[in-house]
Amino acid sequence: MTHPVWIWQYEQWPHFCWNDSNIISLLARVRQQQGQLLGLMSSLGFDTQSHNTLEVMTEDVLRNAEIEGMMLNPDHVRSSVARHLGLDCAGMPEADHYTEGVVQVLMDAVQHADAPLTEERLFNWHAALFPTGRSGITAITVAAWRQGAEPMQVVSGAIGKEQVHYEAPPSERLPQEMAQFLRWINSEESIDPVLKAAIAHLWFVNIHPFDDGNGRLTRTITDMLLARADGSSQRFYSMSAAILRNKKGYYEILEYIGKHGMDITPWLIWFLETIEDAITTAQTRVQRVVQKTLFWQKHISTPLNERQVKIINRLWDGLDGKLNTSKWAKMTHTSSATALRDIQDLVQKGILRDSGEGGRNTNYVLHEHKSCPRCGAAFICQHENPAKCQCAGVKLSPATRAHLAAQYPNQCLCRKCLLEFSI
């Protein structure tokens, strides 16, 4: 017998194997981080939760498409997601028909994550991605498995110099392949739900059952299974955004596994590390939302003009570039003198401070009151200036610092909590 070239040609297909000892600690860490994020979200108010869900699901739709080189209109996506979440859509543009269909796919996947994944459900998702029956100008089979004797190949390169990265099972095998896949998806196995999401991702993308849209539907199935794993119909982190940040690595690991037999340990490690990245990014964003909420609660009675409120909100939401007098004047359409008075007023009120960078122009940053990720207390942190940060005066052992850095990545604890670990 000829040695198998592609993973589905192995006799053991689709009975994947992996080395538990290589993934067990990583999986435990991911599950802990999931719990921390869900706990943090549950402590927030309904409006804050809803806003965060809107932003995450909007990003997920945009990045899932962007991985395939498709750029959707962010305002249309946000409008459609908001409507499906039952949020206020006043002032938002109405989403076009195509965007509405794409959003419906993700909504169905995560809001009905516990519903069985069936052939009909997959066909409905596929039809929503290709409402005209075409991929670009090419007619494709829609809402049905791909057909014909032509091999389904993933290729790159110029015409005549194509490189074949993967070849999927022939179309005559698809009914059997997909029936087996769907039985497994809907079965009550003892496997960890996060590992199930990883395996489903790899399995479906290797079957490649449709003429087009396989990557987007693969990641939709992943979102569905991660929603099951989280026990939540809301998404608080975006796997597609994390994949896009390492798109090259994503395609490299899929190509490697597609050619190297049934041991999928490298894929599971990559998948779990990518979830870690997604959750860490989400934790940072949520902490920012919490900090912004605490800030406005503290300054509810502080007299501020419209220009100051506008710029403060922009700083909390992530201002591009540095804030100085000239940028303030440009953003608020006012004079440099007025901009300087606005800034000096905020400095006196303890809202802005000199960034300490020096140079010809003074740059300003928020004098932030952060919330401790361990106890929730508000405190001032200047982590970008370690000499002035609360962390600086507390002596911690290297092992303790490593432990805290792993448990609370890119975050400071308040001084009270740090002192509990001091030596």
Tell what function each PLM region has.
Residues 377, 393, 419:
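Short Cys/His-rich local motifs and their 1-3 flanking residues in nucleic-acid-associated proteins
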Residues 381-382, 398, 423:
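Short, non-ligating residues that shape and space the ligands of small metal-coordination modules
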